[in-house]
C-alpha cells in the first residue's frame, strides 16, 4: 500500500471572468474548485493509474472537509490529522479576454 502525505493541503479556487479592471466590482462568469497539494495530487494520479493508495496529511476546517470529500468521491481512502485552523485556499483569476491567469 502506498501512503501519500500532504503537510499543507489546499483548495484551488479558480475565478473565471471576462475582464479584470481595477477599482470596480469584477463579476465572475464561473468558478472551479479543486482539492490540491503535492500528496493529494499524487493520490489522484495513482488512482488514475489503478494503484490503490491512502492520502494522509494535516489540515482543518471546512476546507479539509472539502478535500477529503473530493478524495472519497474518487475512491481514494484518506486519513488526515485534523487541526483547528482551516486549510489554505489558493485563489486564481482567469481573465478570458486577456487569455491570462493571475
Language-model features: locations:
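Conserved N-terminal subdomain of the carbohydrate kinase-like
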Residues: 48-102
Amino acid at each position: 500500500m502506498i501512503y501519500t502525505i500532504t503537510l499543507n493541503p489546499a483548495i484551488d479556487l479558480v475565478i473565471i471572468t471576462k475582464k479584470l479592471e481595477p477599482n470596480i466590482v469584477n463579476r465572475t462568469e464561473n468558478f472551479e474548485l479543486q482539492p490540491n497539494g503535492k500528496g493529494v495530487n499524487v493520490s489522484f494520479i495513482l488512482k488514475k493509474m489503478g494503484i490503490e493508495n491512502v492520502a494522509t496529511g494535516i489540515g482543518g476546517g471546512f476546507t479539509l472537509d472539502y478535500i477529503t470529500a473530493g478524495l472519497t468521491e474518487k475512491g481514494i481512502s484518506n486519513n488526515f490529522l485534523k487541526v483547528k485552523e482551516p486549510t489554505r485556499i489558493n485563489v486564481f483569476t482567469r481573465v478570458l479576454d486577456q487569455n491570462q491567469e493571475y
